[in-house]
Amino acid sequence: MSHIIELPEMLANQIAAGEVIERPASVVKELVENAIDAGSSQIIIEIEEAGLKKIQITDNGHGIAHDEVELALRRHATSKIKNQADLFRIRTLGFRGEALPSIASVSVLTLLTAVDGASHGTKLVARGGEVEEVIPATSPVGTKVCVEDLFFNTPARLKYMKSQQAELSHIIDIVNRLGLAHPEISFSLISDGKEMTRTAGTGQLRQAIAGIYGLVSAKKMIEIENSDLDFEISGFVSLPELTRANRNYISLFINGRYIKNFLLNRAILDGFGSKLMVGRFPLAVIHIHIDPYLADVNVHPTKQEVRISKEKELMALVSEAIANSLKEQTLIPDALENLAKSTVRNREKVEQTILPLKENTLYYEKTEPSRPSQTEVADYQVELTDEGQDLTLFAKETLDRLTKPAKLHFAERKPANYDQLDHPELDLASIDKAYDKLEREEASSFPELEFFGQMHGTYLFAQGRDGLYIIDQHAAQERVKYEEYRESIGNVDQSQQQLLVPYIFEFPADDALCLKERMPLLEEVGVFLAEYGENQFILREHPIWMAEEEIESGIYEMCDMLLLTKEVSIKKYRAELAIMMSCKRSIKANHRIDDHSARQLLYQLSQCDNPYNCPHGRPVLVHFTKSDMEKMFRRIQENHTSLRELGKY
């Protein structure tokens, strides 16, 4: 029978370390938060080998008194709270007194500290949680904590560490979040002698954003603010033109503490409304100041999850703050860009009826579609009047061709035994079999469509032999573009187009680090970025399959996708890249196109390997048969048939 015993202090600390200290980034987080609570205005983080060999945090805070240094390494020893009431009004980042003893239990820890007015400082050395020495030492006011050989006595934890690049990325992300949470503090992160991140510590949030995300991104962010009796909201969000492929660039802080909250993320997106594309997310740095009594941070070991009273009111306040700030922005660049790409149809001239005679049909086998000459258009352009003036012969012929049913080219296809159909000895069963085969071929082919209109700048209407077809113009062009890109990206042409003015791309330090590791994937699709300055890359030439006007947005999109890829597969990456590029370059909803462009799109769609679905799997067209239409208008009756059953994909 096993007996209940009290665990030794060191073992208890190691158990606590399993919850609090997951990786080197956890050590950085806990020690930097202690430095912030100590009132520091400057914090320097130095690491070696992604923190596994060494992590050193130096601050200019209040320091620790000589007689309290050893006590700081005991569990639940803290200066942050004194009684139970303090637990419900936490104003500091730390309060449990677990971090320092947990870190010391799985590393070799050296602490050097001094307080203002003391004759000397104090040095403490601990190994695996056991204090080896505490001696007087010379030290400036503040604290320096050096953590070496992390997880040396817990090899199982060390075994599951990721690559140094991945661990370094986590550390950079932690420091970036802390820098955004406290713009009044100067942060500096140095990895193996190279500075990765620096913030000025001026107290200006926009300057902190510029130091982390770059000046270009900071300029494209707008200020937000809102408040009520319980909450005060401030911060910056990006304009709709600056987005990312994931939520990693959304930072929420409550009383200076970085938190993760799904509902508040939802509120941010609601504030943008329809201004964001599907699958795109803004950059956001939002500070929420709240009475500590309304927030419970003691619900998770890492303290990143917070329970908030009046959460619905807070969500509404965040959404309102963002929506109000966006209303004040003209967003003219987006409007001009859309206007430049749009085509407005001329509704005043009847020359719309004088169309290429063969463009109503989509399959051209031997002859190319011909357009009437400019002379023909001038000679036969006719103005329609209410008196019903006679049209010229040419105009009548044109209208006659438009109103005739489209030619069914697939009906002209000959089966393999076509010549045998006229054979006098061929029986009726063979003839029926041949026709059945012909019908199957017709059913499996894309229908011949005759375009006749557009609705709401989004849907195209066309008729075929067997009824009405409604086509989603965005999905249709997305399918066309996808198959083009799939071909061009799948077989990368090494030909490059030289740029007169190179493009400079800037990323946060953790993203830049990850991109360096995965750069060969970009090169596989013909994109060659070279390092250029701190956390910057330069593009001097671009692949010929990429349009020059889409280089900047396209490269950022590709890099975003690359950063999301956890298991690198060039085949999967190329497929996802083709989908992304096709979606971005396709016609959007509420975009009117002229008749010629619509017919051309339908022709291109008919040539696709799979014209029925967009790359995301959504249907491209919906079909209503003539019989379906007659049922809708009750021209014929059929029992137990609902309108929902009439649409067919």
UniProtKB/Swiss-Prot annotation:
This protein is involved in the repair of mismatches in DNA. It is required for dam-dependent methyl-directed DNA mismatch repair. May act as a 'molecular matchmaker', a protein that promotes the formation of a stable complex between two or more DNA-binding proteins in an ATP-dependent manner without itself being part of a final effector complex. Pfam families: DNA_mis_repair, HATPase_c_3, MutL_C. NCBIfam families: mutl (TIGR00585), PRK00095.1-3 (NF000950). One of its GO terms (biological process) is mismatch repair. This is DNA mismatch repair protein MutL. PROSITE patterns: DNA_MISMATCH_REPAIR_1 (PS00058). GO terms for molecular function: ATP binding; ATP hydrolysis activity; ATP-dependent DNA damage sensor activity; mismatched DNA binding. CDD domains: HATPase_MutL-MLH-PMS-like, MutL_Trans. One of its GO terms (cellular component) is mismatch repair complex. Keywords: DNA damage, DNA repair. It comes from Streptococcus pneumoniae (strain JJA). PANTHER family: DNA MISMATCH REPAIR PROTEIN MLH, PMS, MUTL (PTHR10073), DNA MISMATCH REPAIR PROTEIN MLH1 (PTHR10073:SF12). Belongs to the DNA mismatch repair MutL/HexB family. InterPro entries: DNA_mismatch_repair_CS, DNA_mismatch_repair_MutL, DNA_mismatch_S5_2-like, HATPase_C_sf, MutL/Mlh/PMS, MutL/Mlh/Pms-like, MutL_C, MutL_C_dimsub. HAMAP family: DNA_mis_repair.
